[in-house]
Amino acid sequence: MSSSDISVVVCVYTEDRWEDILAAVSSVRAQSLPALETLLVVDHNATLLERLTREYKETDAVRVLANAGPRGLSAGRNTGIAASRGEIIAFLDDDAVAERDWLRHFAAGYADPRVMAVGGRTMPIWASGRRPAWFPEEFDWVVGCTYKGLPPGRVRVRNVLGGNASFRRTAFDAAGGFATGIGRDGDKRPLGCEETELCIRLTRAEPDAILLIDDRAVIHHRVPEARERFGYFRTRAYAEGLSKALVARSVGSGKGLESERRYATRVLPAGVARGLRDALLARPGGAGRAAAIVTGVLTAAGGYVLGSVRARRGGATFSVVEIEGVPDDEGAAA
């Protein structure tokens, strides 16, 4: 696969991440397999849109455009997909940097024409310099990173993780775009699962489709100090439960919770056992990790129950949009 086949979409929303955004773009421009283009999609922030347009107006292959849909990450990604030119569309978080061979490893996965998506491994960069002793690796998804329990290597999966992922353009032709109403909206309650819902929808539309995670496609994701705290851990776990309820409503609880059942019955009990063992051996954080796993499970379950009730009552909605080309509106007001 040539460099001309890959577009990279980075969705941004706040000037507070200015240096992170510049670092993310620089990491894409330094790839051993160059991207066709990098698209910065600004989520309804006119000041940031104007500033980024000035920053990159002389830079080849970096395009800045406004989110053409409702506020939120899903609509921003859909805007990037519609405006992109590559046959493969990769997504990178705005507070992450990609290793040099990130796109090369993505591209290798598409040698098989049945492969419709390839994700990678996301490693945390803790603001404090180290992982909090109580924070279990099994819950690294709380901070947008690859969690303990995912299989190593290049493996087939139910869904990729959105901040470090790529899709064939034809995947969106078959399944539509990311569902709005599920994912994040700036700094509001940290919902997620929009990529899970999309991937399940994709494999239903294309039963022969293969989705992969290749752990050699590595990005490093910054975890701010506020997200190292137990309060955020609980909030994010609760929001995950709310999101999973929406996914189950869309695709059914069987497929929607298939991976989560394995995770809850195999990975998490082993994590609790390790934490308790470490506590007995007087190793730092063991009891805290075991308690955090139990708390995370119960909190997510509570969110799922409430989300399911809301969904049945019609209090939670989302929609799937078809991806259509959008006009080139670089520098337009958000």
Task: Please identify what each model-predicted range represents.
Residues 25-66:
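Acidic donor-binding segment of Leloir-type glycosyltransferases
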Residues 101-134:
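Conserved donor NDP-sugar-binding/catalytic core segment of glycosyltransferases
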Residues 89:
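Short aromatic/hydrophobic "clamp" motif used to bind/position activated sugar donors
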Residues 136-157:
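Short, flexible, basic/aromatic active-site loop/helix in glycosyltransferases
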Residues 162-167, 171-175, 182-217:
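A short, conserved alpha-helix in the catalytic core of glycosyltransferases
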Residues 1-27:
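N-proximal low-complexity "stem/linker" segments adjacent to membrane-targeting elements
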Residues 67-84:
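Glycine-rich, basic loop-to-helix element that forms the pyrophosphate-binding segment
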Residues 235-239, 253-334:
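Non-catalytic, C-terminal membrane-associated alpha-helical segments of glycosyltransferases
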